[in-house]
Design a protein with these regions (language model features):
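Carbohydrate-active catalytic/glycan-binding domains of CAZyme proteins
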Residues: 1-296
Length: 296
């Protein structure tokens, strides 16, 4: 069977995350980033504004190496691309570069579960230079770890587990008094099991006084849609939540077979959407990569 390849593309939506969560992407003005070269993609966008500049961090992935790095794309106030560079590279695959500000510093918490660890980085010279601060130990090797400071403590939401079903459909939580830890796994972990809405997919936000978390709907395909998980109660001992309907990818683009990031960034919101390549070239690329590795 030909190898199917998910190819993602990032969009900048001129709407706030609360608006999109309420009504979806239909009718929204979306500025799509340029397509990547063949069998490469940018995904998992997160960003910060500084002095009328949008600093957008994303996973840059090439199917020829099957290794993700973190790229930075810088835009001006009119969302014109000014620069692009790789700012974080490790021996292991990196993705989901959750970037945020806290305690007078700028932090990044990229997904790196293939390293069996979660590493917290701090900007030494934003946005280009980052240093390792600590490695966070949790009950599973975390996937798409998503932090937020809420109700006087830090919370961390993540997926993970020994099999694909857990990685797609199990949501865990942990809490800490300080960002650097120690972190305490929630006693009800996994706090949610649902392939249709458990794996984190963007920035948490408040709707009124209710904490909301974008999660991925993976029932039909990986990252098929985004849903909003509302926490009606969240303490170190208890959790009560409800989930909203799927938010679908835009239909007026070839990238309409998936949507798995919804990230607030000031007056704009960052998303990604995918198309699936079914040509069989992915199988040939895999074969060539394995041959190169065997010959090395």
């Amino acid at each position: 069977m030909p190898r199917r390849c998910d190819l993602w593309r990032i969009g900048i939506v001129r709407a706030a995350i609360v608006e999109i969560a309420a009504t979806g992407l239909a009718g929204c003005e979306i500025q799509w980033l340029a397509e990547e070269p063949s069998f490469r993609f940018l995904a998992d966008p997160f960003g910060l504004w500084r002095e009328d500049r949008l600093f957008l961090f994303a996973e840059a992935y090439d199917y020829r190496t099957r290794h993700g790095v973190i790229d930075l794309l810088t835009f001006d106030a009119e969302l014109r691309l000014l620069d692009r560079a790789t700012v974080l590279r490790e021996p292991w695959h990196l993705s989901y570069p959750y970037v945020f500000e806290a305690d007078g510093a700028t932090w990044m918490l990229p997904e790196a579960h293939r390293s069996d660890s979660l590493t917290l980085y701090r900007a030494v010279d934003f946005p280009d230079r980052w240093e390792v601060v600590t490695r966070i130990a949790l009950d599973v090797a975390p996937i798409d770890a998503t932090p937020i400071h809420h109700d006087g403590r830090w919370w961390l939401f993540y997926s993970g587990g020994p099999n694909r079903e857990d990685r797609m459909g199990a949501l865990h939580a942990a809490w800490a008094e300080r960002l650097e830890g120690p972190w305490h796994a929630h006693p009800r972990n996994p706090i949610r099991r649902d392939r249709g809405g458990a794996r984190p997919g963007g920035t948490p936000f408040l709707n009124g006084d209710v904490l909301c978390l974008p999660v991925q709907d993976c029932r039909h395909t990986y990252g098929g849609a985004v849903r909003i998980l509302r926490f009606n109660r969240l303490t170190p001992d208890t959790v009560e939540m409800e989930i909203g309907p799927p938010l679908r990818p835009p239909v007026d683009t070839p990238y309409r077979e998936g949507f798995h990031t919804l990230a607030a960034c000031g007056s704009v919101t960052l998303i990604d959407a995918k198309r699936i390549d079914r040509s069989g070239r992915g199988w040939l690329i895999d074969l060539a990569r394995r041959f190169r590795n065997a010959s090395a």
